[in-house]
């Protein structure tokens, strides 16, 4: 039977739309330890020796360590008096490298500042320089030392997953550990790119995207079947053999055999036309159009590059942009721009080399890495990545041909992305200066935190915090707060905001104390603070912006006063104006009457943008919590049943209801379910 011989009777409805499944849930995401060789080392703790140096710091204290260092490869850490890691480095010879620091002759101000702040060092000796490089990259990502080149926005990449653990495989977006059986395609540059591709692939191959439990409980096809986005295998609208053909075609397309798939579909369309089956021919036509839509969004699809990541670096205005393009199976899966923190005095080769080592610390490595320019220790880096991947990884700088065109295109994108960022940073700086003037701040704020709540009649209440700074929104600093208190009256926004403030600033005091990081850094760095770009983003806010009026501000100020930090943080309230019109907002600042800003004031637009962003984040967090609550399973209530066992039980029995009816002997047959766990599940459903 043809995969497209489907029943045409309208059997689904709008209320039958299946719940979306997204395997990107960060709560379920596993942490993947980087694979590779075991790093054998001998730890040498020189801290007691440094402590005997009677308060010596800088080159003087480093000199006391050099004579006892081995002439062997390894990794070193430089730390200040507070125990903060300043720098992590690797060396072919620890003795020779540290001797350079001990001599007190520095090539740059950055190294001079770093050495002057050093009060102790720690060392790890490795078997090879390759192991030292891998360990260095891992430590830099974990410790984020001030004076290293640091990656930012290092979220893992999303993939497309075609499952292999069900008779009717589904297509999903996946991020995190590849623990589920199936075929993974990617990486993609963004979750949006994955979503668009999956939408087009569903139109082309009619693959399901519902949960297994939803699939098992269907008695009629859902809405996706009616709009020709699914073949309806759940209710037998297509045979298992026919559906398997569609899955095989999807795998061929994602594996780079797109021309073969398009040729076969085109031939089937021609045959349907000759048979005067124009309805079926139209379905094939739409499938071809969907495939063309996927490829039109891929841009460059090289003929001679099957699998490669392309990197290009551009430096300008004291900042760096590294553009990355991903090519798999001859297809362009997108690109992403990175803006690592790096001293402007560093050469591009050093920045790019350090970036690559950190980039692949926890990501799969392709067979080819193409660079716009060479990097330091390029051969060593290639050997290290090959060791980690368990196969040959080639790093090259193309000089001609299609590969050179790819690196040139990446370099052009890097230039344009950095140009846009420099323009945005300049504009952001002017806005922050205007913000400080408008609200009477001594200097432009470095960290602004914006807060809001979202709920429906008090249910699934969520507090949200977004963060903005000189470079715009800092999304890796965003936080959400699930409202926990049972004493808050449903819908009590004041009570919710009190809980959010208490949790946020109590934790901040516990983790960072009552010391302003900016002030401490300034005192330490002295006159060189202007040049020290390596300082981390501050944890303490200069300003908190509350979406609310006088009542909200009263609650917030009381919390800040109770915690003893009312004078540390400037709190500003923003209330919707008359008729809730944008432009009529009123602002509440301590010591001043409420006031409004001129309708066309750039600072007003800036504050509105901050408020809109926290609205978006709060509403999205609330919807996610509400959705999770709606699809909650009785299995979630059983202690000891986590996501893995829950998935195994649902795969075996189809539904939670079927699990509740199962005997202990049947439960024990499921992979991962011991006799003890089986009794736990059985007793949960059969307690009188």
Curated annotation (Swiss-Prot):
Biased composition (Basic and acidic residues): 1-14
Main location: cytoplasm
Molecular function terms, GO-annotated: DNA binding; excinuclease ABC activity
Domain GIY-YIG: from-to ranges: 71-149
Subcellular location: Cytoplasm
Keywords, alphabetical: Cytoplasm, DNA damage, DNA excision, DNA repair, Excision nuclease, SOS response
Domain of life: Bacteria
Region Disordered: start-end pairs: 1-20
GO cellular component: cytoplasm; excinuclease repair complex
Listed PROSITE patterns: GIY_YIG, UVR, UVRC
Domain UVR: 259-294
Pfam families (UniProt xref): GIY-YIG (PF01541), HHH_5 (PF14520), UVR (PF02151), UvrC_RNaseH (PF22920), UvrC_RNaseH_dom (PF08459)
GO biological process entries: nucleotide-excision repair; SOS response
Quaternary assembly: Interacts with UvrB in an incision complex.
Function: The UvrABC repair system catalyzes the recognition and processing of DNA lesions. UvrC both incises the 5' and 3' sides of the lesion. The N-terminal half is responsible for the 3' incision and the C-terminal half is responsible for the 5' incision.
PANTHER family: UVRABC SYSTEM PROTEIN C (PTHR30562:SF1), UVRC/OXIDOREDUCTASE (PTHR30562)
Entry's family note: Belongs to the UvrC family.
Protein name: UvrABC system protein C
Organism of this sequence: Mesorhizobium japonicum (strain LMG 29417 / CECT 9101 / MAFF 303099) (Mesorhizobium loti (strain MAFF 303099))
């Amino acid at each position: 039977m043809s995969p497209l011989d489907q029943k045409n009777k309208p059997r689904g409805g709008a209320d039958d739309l299946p719940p979306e499944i997204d395997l990107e849930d960060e709560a379920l995401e596993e942490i993947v330890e980087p694979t590779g060789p075991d790093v054998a080392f001998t730890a040498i703790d020189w801290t007691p020796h440094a402590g005997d140096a009677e308060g010596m710091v800088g080159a003087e204290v480093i000199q006391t360590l050099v004579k006892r260092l081995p002439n062997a490869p390894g990794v070193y850490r430089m730390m200040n008096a507070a125990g903060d890691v300043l720098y992590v480095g690797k060396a072919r010879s620890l003795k020779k490298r540290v001797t350079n620091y001990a001599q007190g002759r520095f090539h740059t101000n950055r190294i001079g500042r770093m050495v002057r702040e050093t009060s102790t060092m720690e060392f790890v000796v490795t078997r090879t320089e390759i192991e030292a490089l891998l360990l260095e990259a891992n430590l830099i990502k974990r410790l984020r030392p001030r004076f290293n080149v640091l990656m930012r926005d290092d979220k893992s990449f999303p993939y497309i997953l075609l499952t292999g653990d069900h008779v009717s495989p589904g297509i999903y977006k996946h991020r995190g550990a590849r623990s589920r059986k199936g075929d993974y395609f990617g990486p993609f540059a963004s979750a949006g790119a994955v979503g668009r591709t999956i939408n087009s692939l569903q139109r082309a191959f009619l693959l399901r995207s519902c949960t297994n439990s939803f699939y098992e409980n269907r008695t009629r096809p859902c809405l996706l079947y009616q709009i020709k986005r699914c073949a309806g295998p759940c209710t037998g609208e297509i045979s298992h053999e026919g559906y398997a053909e569609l899955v095989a075609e999807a795998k061929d397309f994602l594996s780079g055999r797109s021309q073969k798939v398009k040729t076969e579909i085109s031939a089937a369309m021609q045959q349907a036309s000759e048979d005067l089956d124009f309805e079926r021919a139209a379905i094939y036509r739409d499938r071809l159009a969907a495939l063309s839509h996927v490829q039109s969004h891929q841009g460059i699809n090289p003929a001679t590059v099957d699998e490669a990541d392309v990197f290009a670096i551009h430096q300008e205005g004291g900042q760096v942009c590294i553009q990355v393009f991903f090519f798999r199976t001859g297809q362009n899966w997108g690109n992403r721009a990175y803006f690592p923190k790096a001293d402007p005095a560093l050469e591009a080769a050093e920045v790019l080399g350090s970036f690559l080592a950190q980039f692949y610390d926890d990501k799969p490595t392709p067979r080819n890495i193409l660079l716009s320019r060479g990097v330091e220790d390029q051969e060593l880096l290639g050997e290290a990545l090959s060791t980690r991947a368990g196969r040959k990884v080639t790093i090259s700088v193309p000089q001609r041909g299609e590969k050179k065109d790819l690196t040139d295109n990446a370099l052009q994108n890097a230039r344009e992305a950095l140009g846009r960022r420099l323009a945005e940073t300049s504009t952001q700086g002017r806005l922050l200066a205007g913000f400080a003037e408008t609200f009477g701040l001594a200097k432009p704020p470095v960290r602004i935190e914006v807060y809001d709540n979202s709920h429906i009649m008090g249910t699934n209440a969520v507090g949200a915090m977004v963060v903005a700074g000189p470079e715009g929104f800092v999304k890796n600093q965003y936080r959400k707060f699930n409202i926990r208190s049972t004493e808050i009256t449903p819908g009590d926004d004041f009570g919710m905001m009190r809980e959010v403030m208490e949790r946020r600033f109590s934790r901040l005091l516990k983790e960072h104390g009552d010391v302003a990081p900016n002030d401490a850094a300034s005192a330490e760095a002295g006159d060189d603070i202007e040049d020290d770009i390596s300082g981390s983003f501050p944890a303490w806010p200069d300003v908190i912006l509350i979406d609310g009026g006088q009542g909200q501000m009263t609650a917030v100020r009381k919390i800040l006063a109770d915690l003893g930090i009312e004078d540390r943080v400037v709190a500003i309230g923003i209330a919707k104006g008359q008729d809730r019109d944008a432009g009529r907002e009123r602002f509440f600042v301590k010591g001043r009457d409420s006031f409004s800003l001129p309708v066309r004031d750039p600072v007003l637009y800036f504050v509105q943008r901050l408020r809109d962003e926290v609205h978006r984040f709060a509403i999205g967090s609330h919807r996610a919590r509400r959705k999770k609550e709606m699809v909650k399973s009785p299995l979630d209530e059983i202690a000891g049943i986590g996501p893995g066992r829950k998935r195994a039980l649902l795969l075996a029995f189809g539904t939670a209801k079927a699990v509740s009816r199962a005997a202990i002997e049947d439960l024990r047959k499921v992979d991962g379910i011991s006799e003890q766990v089986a009794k736990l599940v059985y007793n949960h459903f059969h307690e009188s």
